[in-house]
A protein has these predicted regions:
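Cyclophilin-like peptidyl-prolyl cis-trans isomerases
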Residues: 2-181
Length: 181
């Protein structure tokens, strides 16, 4: 008698940029389940549509997901930081193409802001909730990070996310567990 295992396919996010570029990323619910639920929930609510990558640093990452476009905004709540130094096993390394949640100093302060690695950054491993990886369109992120920026790393020309969608491959992801602000 042999055991039959059914593996569910991971969700795939499509980030369509206003300039026509597209980035696709696979999310890893087995690594950071609540982070993935939160990201999917925000995408399905249209939260990211029209927002910008407000912080881009060559050789490091691009950051988006702030409704104010300043790096100070969020969805009005936080989620528990699913990373090792916060008592949660997460071994996904911050290598090129990895998606991770931005946060303030408090480990449970992530909300909607995320960053996409354009280079390896091992010093972030275990400190931030990595939860997915680009599977297509990394060259779009490379183009975004190469844009001219001001002293606060904000692009002079807005890098606009026209629409973000997610294909959950038929799986249902419930509401995320949130921490009210």
């Amino acid at each position: 008698m042999f055991e039959r295992r059914i593996f569910m396919a991971n969700p795939i996010v499509t980030i369509k940029m206003k300039d026509g570029g597209t980035i696709k990323a696979e999310l890893y619910p087995e690594i950071a389940p609540n982070t993935v639920k939160n990201f999917i929930d925000l995408i399905n609510r249209g939260f990211y549509d029209g927002l910008i990558f407000h912080r881009v640093i060559p050789g490091f990452m691009i950051q988006g997901g702030c409704p104010e476009g300043t790096g100070m905004g969020g969805p009005g709540y936080g989620i528990k930081g699913e990373f090792t130094s916060n008592g949660f096993k997460n071994e996904l390394k911050h290598s090129k193409g990895v998606l991770s949640m931005a946060r303030a100093m408090h480990p449970d302060s992530a909300g909607s802001q995320f960053f996409l690695m354009v280079a390896n950054a091992p010093h972030l491993d275990g400190q931030y909730a990595s939860f997915g990886k680009v599977i297509e369109g990394i060259e779009v992120a490379d183009k975004i990070v190469a844009t001219k920026t001001d002293r606060q790393d904000r692009p002079y020309e807005d890098q606009v996310i026209e629409k973000m969608t997610v294909d959950t491959q038929g799986e249902t992801y419930g509401e995320p567990e949130i921490i009210e602000e």
